[in-house]
Regions:
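Short acidic/glycine-rich loop or secondary-structure boundary segments that cap or lie
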Residues: 141-143, 170-175, 197-202
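Short, conserved beta-strand edge motifs with alternating hydrophobic and charged residues
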Residues: 133-135, 161-165, 189-194
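Glycine-rich beta-alpha junction loops
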Residues: 168, 193-199, 249-251
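Active-site beta->alpha loop and helix N-cap motifs at the rims of alpha/beta catalytic domains
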Residues: 2-148, 156-159, 216-230, 237-242, ...
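Catalytic-face loop-and-helix region of soluble metabolic enzyme cores
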Residues: 188-241
Length: 275
């Protein structure tokens, strides 16, 4: 069963967790040595030096690798102009390095300030110089509102991917994926996955994250959480959704072993490329 599921899934993306540029380099070297080629950089603070992190990735990676740099409208107060500048900068770096660079536009957690809505970014999303994705939560109480918000983001035609919030209400997920595939068949879909570890479960029991829909079964322990995670991945495979491995992060060999157990071993990495 596990082998069949791994074979049906697309190779996972890995969200990068680090505190310093040196640690970022170490993560990239360990993960590429293990065969992983696609990564995400998270924007959690207005002081995040995102383009400097992208430069580190471009130094360590090469053609065939790709990096998605998140852009939080909460932490980038100039809205559309700031996003347009980011997209142009990524396009230039991608051309110079051969690394495929893209952006995931998110609103950020907590209450949004005036001007921090996707509609204010419409100009930058109309014809972006580098690929842009937007977020979608298939577990919202008001899905009509969530669908309408997504349709507004996609109206300009410049968005190429939709990124799904993590959760385990699988009937809701299946329903929304059916709608997404019927309504926007050309879009790439990426779905979040949490690693079912003791650390993650303890974290979510103590202080659950806003908008994350987890069940009592999932929170009952690592074995149950892994079982539910495999059911989630089966839904992703059914709808050709690419997984994104998020919390609590792939930081150690033990974390990497959990990823391999869920997804199988990645393709052998090519020899190291230096540009």
């Amino acid at each position: 069963m596990a082998a069949q599921l791994a074979g049906a899934l697309r190779p996972p993306r890995i969200e990068l967790f680090f505190k310093t540029p040196a640690e970022l380099k170490e993560r990239l070297r360990d993960l590429t040595a293990a065969g992983y080629r696609s990564f995400n950089l998270v924007n959690k603070d207005k002081k995040d030096p995102m383009l400097a992190w992208v430069d580190v990735c471009c130094e360590e990676l090469g053609p065939g690798d790709d990096v998605c740099a998140h852009f939080s409208s909460k932490y980038n107060a100039r809205g559309g102009p700031a996003l347009a500048e980011r997209l142009a900068a990524l396009a230039a770096r991608s051309q110079a390095s051969g690394v495929a660079l893209s952006t995931l536009l998110v609103s950020g957690s907590g209450k949004r300030k005036k001007g921090h809505f996707a509609s204010d970014l419409a100009g930058a999303l109309n014809a972006p110089p580098s690929p842009v994705g937007v977020a979608f939560n298939p577990y919202e109480d008001d899905m009509e509102k969530e669908r309408a918000a997504l349709a507004a983001k996609l109206k300009g035609g410049g968005v190429s991917s939709v990124w799904l919030q993590f959760g385990v209400r699988l009937e809701d997920l299946d329903r929304e994926l059916l709608w997404l595939r019927a309504s926007f068949p050309s879009l790439e879909l990426v779905g979040s996955v949490f690693l079912p570890t003791k650390k993650l479960i303890a974290q979510q029991k103590f202080r659950p994250w806003n908008g994350v829909a987890l069940s009592d079964e999932y929170l009952s322990g690592p074995e149950a959480a892994e079982r539910v995670t495999r059911q989630l991945l089966a839904v992703y495979a059914k709808h050709d959704v690419r997984p994104l491995v998020e919390a609590p992060g792939v930081r150690t060999a033990k974390d990497l072993a959990v990823v391999s157990r869920l997804f199988g071993e990645p393709a052998p990495p090519a020899k190291k490329r230096r540009l």
